Swiss-Prot record:
UniProt xrefs under SUPFAM superfamilies: Bacterial photosystem II reaction centre, L and M subunits
Keywords linked to the UniProt accession: Chlorophyll, Chloroplast, Chromophore, Electron transport, Iron, Magnesium, Membrane, Metal-binding, Oxidoreductase, Photosynthesis, Photosystem II, Plastid, Thylakoid, Transmembrane, Transmembrane helix, Transport
Stated role: Photosystem II (PSII) is a light-driven water:plastoquinone oxidoreductase that uses light energy to abstract electrons from H(2)O, generating O(2) and a proton gradient subsequently used for ATP formation. It consists of a core antenna complex that captures photons, and an electron transfer chain that converts photonic excitation into a charge separation. The D1/D2 (PsbA/PsbD) reaction center heterodimer binds P680, the primary electron donor of PSII as well as several subsequent electron acceptors. D2 is needed for assembly of a stable PSII complex.
Name by which UniProt lists this protein: Photosystem II D2 protein
Subunit structure: PSII is composed of 1 copy each of membrane proteins PsbA, PsbB, PsbC, PsbD, PsbE, PsbF, PsbH, PsbI, PsbJ, PsbK, PsbL, PsbM, PsbT, PsbX, PsbY, PsbZ, Psb30/Ycf12, at least 3 peripheral proteins of the oxygen-evolving complex and a large number of cofactors. It forms dimeric complexes.
Length: 351
């Protein structure tokens, strides 16, 4: 009789690494964690460092750190100087030449934060894909998170790439983002852009749907215990439904005349509306990067120029945009030394 003894198959370094990364632990790491955790740590660290210590005097002529007297709303990691163009501003590159102080002064922390932040967001999206695959879920969480990634990449990376330099990207700070929004309105008439309109409809529509859905579920909870309220009389492992879809359907059928009768379609709609809005606004920002125009109602502008008694909300907004451009350009781009004579500043009923 012959006895065959099988040899255990040798496992390579990849298999050992795979086992270690996917081990069940309090904070899952996974392959996506190799991208997520270092990039997120470095992006947040750079942002906290910049807002605490680094000035924007050499890039924007501004104070932007806690050290200079700013608060949480006015501190920022500001975009690099216009003269830097689209350089990645490596610490060891020709601009900084290994000098950390000079690197901070010319805006190196901004490119560092933007690029590591983008890869951190992508790593978080891949993390959702990876965990969903391991536990047998569909990947719709990761698909939904593509919306915020698209917005971040289009606003912070693609828009300035279409313009003259990183200088025209938003700074990483609350007031800095507000300044960027005013810039988009004045120089691109962003609020009249159809992609902006779709983005607003998606985000506000998603908030409305979320509120309606949550309220409807709360309204139709089953009285399934002695204390049947929102926080009691429910166990996470129970097999029974905790609210009545039938009652909810009857309620909204009476309110609107139509209602969702399929939970899967209902929740897909809740997913689709805000994500579609985020993607639409991202596409619009890419259009702005290429300096594509929004709606132009030239006939109204011509008539308003000829007839002082004719004015529309559109012509008022056009005048306001001219004002933003004229008064903002000199403040926003001090390195250009803009000087506007009074006769070129906008005048009209809107101002």
């Amino acid at each position: 009789m012959t006895i065959a003894i099988g040899r255990e198959q040798e496992r390579g370094w990849f298999d050992l690494m795979d086992d270690w990364l996917k081990r069940d632990r309090f904070v899952f790491i996974g392959w996506s964690g190799l991208l997520l955790f270092p990039c997120s740590y470095l992006a947040l660290g750079a942002w906290f460092t910049g807002t605490t210590f680094v000035t924007s005097w050499y890039t924007h002529g501004l104070a932007s750190s806690y050290l200079e007297g700013c608060n949480f709303l006015t501190a920022a990691v500001s975009s690099p100087a216009n003269s830097m163009g689209h350089s990645l501003l490596f610490l060891w590159g020709p601009e900084a030449q290994g000098d950390f102080t000079r690197w901070c002064q010319i805006g190196g922390l901004w490119t560092f934060t933007a690029l590591h932040g983008a890869f951190g967001l992508i790593g978080f999206c891949l993390r959702q894909f990876e965990i969903a695959r391991l536990v047998g879920l569909r990947p719709y969480n990761a698909i939904a998170f593509s919306g915020p990634i698209a917005v971040f990449v289009s606003v912070f990376l693609l828009y300035p790439l279409g313009q003259a330099s990183w200088f025209f990207a938003p700074s990483f700070g609350v007031a800095g983002i507000f300044r960027f929004i005013l810039f988009l309105q004045g120089f691109h008439n962003w609020t009249l852009n159809p992609f902006h309109m779709m983005g607003v409809a998606g985000i506000l529509g998603g908030a409305l749907l979320c509120a309606i859905h949550g309220a409807t579920v709360q309204n139709t909870l089953f009285e399934d215990g002695e204390a049947s309220d929102t926080f009691r009389a429910f166990t996470p492992t129970q097999s029974e439904e905790t609210y009545s879809m039938v009652t909810a359907n009857r309620f909204w059928s009476q309110i609107f005349g139509v209602a969702f009768s399929n939970k899967r379609w209902l929740h897909f709609f809740l997913l689709f509306v805000p994500v579609a809005g985020l993607w639409a606004s991202s596409i619009g920002i890419v259009g702005l990067a290429l300096n594509l125009r929004a709606y132009d109602f030239v006939s109204q502008e011509l008539r308003a120029a000829e007839d002082p008694e004719f004015e529309t909300f559109y012509t008022k907004n056009i005048l306001l945009n001219e004002g933003i451009r004229a008064w903002m350009a000199a403040q926003d781009q001090p390195h250009e030394n803009f000087v506007f004579p009074e006769e070129v500043l906008p005048r009209g009923n809107a101002l």
